[in-house]
Amino acid sequence: MNSNVHHRKPRLVFFQWDHQPNANAAGYLLLHMQQQAKCLATHFDVVIISRDCDYAEICDRYEPDLTLFESGYRSHGSRRIKITNTNTHVAVPKLGLHNADPWCDRRAGFLSDMEQWGIETYFAIATMTPEYMPAVKENLFVWPNFIDPEVYHDYGQQKVIPVTLTGQVYGLYPWRQTVFPMIRDRYPCLVSPQHAYESKLASQLLSGEAYARALNASLVVPTCGTMGGEVVRKHFEIPGAKACLVTERTAAVEAAGFVDMENCVFVDGHNVVERLDYLFAHPDEIQRITTAGHSLIHSRHTVNHRPQIYQWFLLNKGLQFGEKIIQSGPFGELAKVKRVAKHESVHIVGKASDRALLNQGDLLLEQDRVGEAKHCYARCLDYVSYLPEAKFRLAICALREGDADRAYDLLVDLVKVTVIEYGAVDPDPVEWAYFLLALICKGQLERARRLQDFYPSLSHEEFRRARLVIAQLGCSGGVVAGLYGRERKSIHQVPDRSDSEWLTWFDNILERCQQPDLANVLRQAPAGGSGTSAKVTAPYFKGDAGWRLRLYSGVDGLMVKLRLTNLRPNVPPLPEFRYLRHLVRALVPKSQRGAMRWIRTALSWPPV
């Protein structure tokens, strides 16, 4: 670390994705990322690295006092950068930044990144993230959204727009779906079109100063924080530009300091018309609320009011044995406490609609009311079509209903999102464990056995149990080593069962999936994998690998034997993961890939 830290701002190297491609689409996303760097610069000498790089080289060149790694972003054109040699310069503290929605399907990728980079402390921009990643909430702090006061302020615009309606209005935003049409049908409105982030049409949307001036010219502007009850940037941008915020009452919004009819207006589908009629009939009330909201934002929610990362840096430098750092709330400061005092960070306990449905479905599934549980999980997808917790639970429901193929397809999709679409080194450990179990339920035990070590750094209790099943069904004595190392974090929460309870549960799953022979072997195997009971002789099971699958497996094994692991695809050697396509991309220059298409086409046929 640089010895001049006391004579200047500490130096922070921020490994930020390359967000520049958004300049040609949703330019406001690029502005958000630039504002994050500006906020960090209030306390740090910030160096931005947005390219593939060697961590050791960067640290040697810039001598940082702290490094911050952006991760978990759901790319809308942004490029995830590759960082190597992160196990060097251990004296430099490292932080992860979950720069995404709390329900994002890249959370498993975020956790994989943190593991690979050796990061154990994280910040998130969303106040609800601890509820969506409970496995890491003890070391997770909130660096909440904010505004740039140089952009969002009172421009003195004449209030010529009664209502401005801006933002997306699809399933993720049920409050807007209810309230916006009621407002649009009754009052004169400036309505912004809805364009996807990655659409070129998004470049036509108002952003920056133009957007702030439109807000400043508006009397009232409604917004909400999604089905998750989050605090989004619009909650701060609207009053920051001196317009009256009309919004949904949530725990997170109240934690930000918003008070009904004092500095904002809380409405729902039952009273929105009544309340807006009152406000438009009493312009002095609108002005009073607007002024108070403007004051709240500029005194608490600008780039100058987000010192949490800097506070962590200072506290961590003097952290003693037996001490830890906690946060007083999502917008609160960080402080040191004694571990023996058992103080914890204060997180928002909200009423996110998807969490409520997941909990309801879990209770129904526990009662074996699978159909009703499926309905709850499917309703989650109406809010977030890619929600991994809902898809994972639907896979469990499919296994309970004996539909191993459906479960397998869902689990394949989950693994694909993390290792292919996001590009993580390995998938969520629980998703991988149940992917292997789904293979077994399809009668493909040998394939599961071959794949169980494909991601060697994965370690989790559910994965250990999947390996135990493979060992017992393969009659290898049923002895499985414990966890390979520290248990990997998962975004999924599974029922708390003993090994014997879990094995009984999976034995039942095998029966439902029409695998009575496998179920019988598992039923007679020593519970818990102790290996102390008499070995069970397994019946003959037909090999489950056709010639194409054997070829895929053979090619992958050859890559390992030839020590070409740096070119080996990071996906299982199976057609459904497009293994050959990834192999060709690694081995063949772009100019020569056309000649390989016929091979890829032949090998992509359904396995026989």
What do these predicted ranges mean?
Residues 2-62, 69-85, 97-236, 240-241, ...:
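Nucleotide-sugar donor-binding catalytic core of glycosyltransferases
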